[in-house]
Amino acid sequence: MDYFENVPKVQYEGKNAKSKYAFRHYNPEEIIMGKPMKDHLRFSVAFWHTMTEDGSDPFGDGTYQRNWEGSTPMETAKNRVDAFFEILEKLGAEYFCFHDVDIAPQGDSLKEFLENIDVMTDYIKGKMDKTGVKLLWNTANMFTHPTFVNGAATTNNADVYSMAAAQVKKGLDVSKKLNGENYVFWGGREGYENLLNTDMNFELDNLARFYQMVIDYAQKIDYHPQFLIEPKPKEPTKHQYDYDAATAMAFIQKYNLEDSFKLNLEANHATLAGHTFEHELNVAKNYNALGSLDANQGDLLLGWDTDEFPTDIYTATLAMYEVLDFGGIAPGGLNFDAKVRRTSFAMDDLILAHIAGMDTYARGLRAAAKMKDDNFFEQIIANRYESFSSGIGKQIVENKEDLESLTNYALSLNGVENKSGHIEHLKSLLNDYLV
């Protein structure tokens, strides 16, 4: 069955494209800074928002028109995989991501769930072998089921901790089976609702123990992915332990996990944490921990995770600048952790939304590459910190000064003269790269 029979394969047609099923900016084979655009961006489609959402919200029923529902949960699961790989083929997307519960019915027991995962990953592997599509990352959903009401690896219940371990073990087995390039941990329930009954230090110690078990098991099965922690400050838990990039890195460093873990950063999660997306990427870059991106955007007027498809060229440009400055995102990628709006309920909206996101990041990549070629930010930063490139500043950087010598220097000064940052002018110059 063709699920999108009225949608052609999406091709690059340029800014004057007449078809809505065309890329106007994403040209996969276009060479930018020495390699094809597709290799810079490494686009991935998220199974969960694409295939399992129905458009419902707390105030209304689902609106999405979908044609893959079967007569049994397993039939529906296989239909979804068929439709999903058709979407990947239409878009020319080379990667995908999923949670375990996205692809397999959970059944009535852990045993049945794990068996269903085996069946469905066999089915998915067949599709991968046929199409050449690759798994960017998979993860275990340990936040939806009532079992995880108090967390998974930070739970107060040792039985629940064991259930989480079993689910992640299967996730690692699956990732090896499908040759996943990364494995993600997002702790939606790893945090606390009320500090009055929480031993935070104990919970974080247990979380670190869990991650060490993950490292040990991966070595045992000779599987070496890039492990990624995905920060988010809140939602669904009031206070989540992986609040933002800096908090996650503090945890990683405290427990000596730097050799195994980097960060998967999401734009909307940055918004919820009170940061820009580029801030989070810059923090991760400075720790050498920029692992992968969830390319979406939030609504600055709302206080929750709206997971919109990215259309903000300004944010995409600054994000891609950080990626280029880091030397690239591989083995990570840009995963569209985004869902179509409730009013975008037609089947082809799934294709159109991904086209919009892919075009947006293609424009961001082009602009960021031009800025790198022009040394735009490099010159600005060099000028701002030039006092540390000679004289007393250079002496400070070379660790040749101390408090006493700097005091003597300060006393010899006849006042201090600061330079204007000209920030409005710099923003105006940045805008010139975006048109």
UniProtKB/Swiss-Prot annotation:
Q: Which domain of life is it from?
A: Bacteria
UniProt-listed PROSITE patterns: XYLOSE_ISOMERASE (PS51415)
EC number(s) for this protein? 5.3.1.5
- List locations, semicolon-separated: Cytoplasm
Q: Name one GO molecular function term.
A: xylose isomerase activity
Record has Nucleus as a keyword = no
The primary location reported for this protein is cytoplasm
Q: List the disulfide bonds.
A: none
Q: Which family does it belong to?
A: Belongs to the xylose isomerase family.
Provide the assembly information. Homotetramer.
Name the record gives this protein? Xylose isomerase
